[in-house]
């Protein structure tokens, strides 16, 4: 989901449609290196510079940078629901974009024989299924 601080887009820097992000600083998450390129392609904005801009290892740091007006970020909506509800962040252009990344649980097959691990695996898989009902796209 595209996020931006209200102060950054007031006045002549408004973001109403996807093309309006051209010229703004894009904030990148190191774990989602193609997110901006995918967003631009899915929104028909090929002229946006999707490589330049600061990079963050943690979504929390990227979100804080957006809150401080340092640029526009792409983050899972799940991580900014409170900031959006409070109006601290805006999500102009609405439409989220699915990115081609996921989470994986890697383990040795013999670990399923351990009750504690089997319970953890079941729990984490259930949590993943529940989050499918929550908008987690970037």
Language model features with spans:
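C-terminal regulatory
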Residues: 1-70, 75-100, 126-138
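Bilobed periplasmic-binding protein/Venus flytrap-like ligand-binding cleft at the lobe interface
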Residues: 105, 116-129
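Basic side chains
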Residues: 55, 77, 108-111, 121
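A bilobed periplasmic-binding-protein/Venus flytrap-type ligand-binding module shared by bacterial periplasmic
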Residues: 3-6, 103-113
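Short, structured helix-loop boundary elements
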Residues: 33, 114-117
């Amino acid at each position: 989901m595209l996020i931006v601080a209200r102060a950054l887009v007031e006045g002549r820097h408004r973001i109403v449609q996807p093309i309006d992000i051209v010229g703004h600083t894009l904030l990148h998450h190191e774990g989602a290196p193609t997110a901006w390129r995918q967003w631009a392609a899915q929104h028909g904005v090929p002229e946006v510079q999707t490589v330049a801009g600061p990079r963050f290892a943690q979504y929390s740091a990227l979100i804080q940078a957006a809150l401080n007006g340092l640029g526009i970020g792409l983050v899972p909506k799940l991580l900014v629901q409170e900031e959006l509800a409070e109006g601290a962040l805006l999500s102009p252009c609405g439409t989220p974009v699915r990115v081609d990344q996921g989470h994986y649980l890697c383990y040795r097959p013999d670990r399923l024989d351990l009750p504690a691990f089997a319970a953890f695996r079941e729990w984490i898989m259930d949590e993943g299924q529940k989050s499918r009902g929550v908008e987690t796209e970037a």
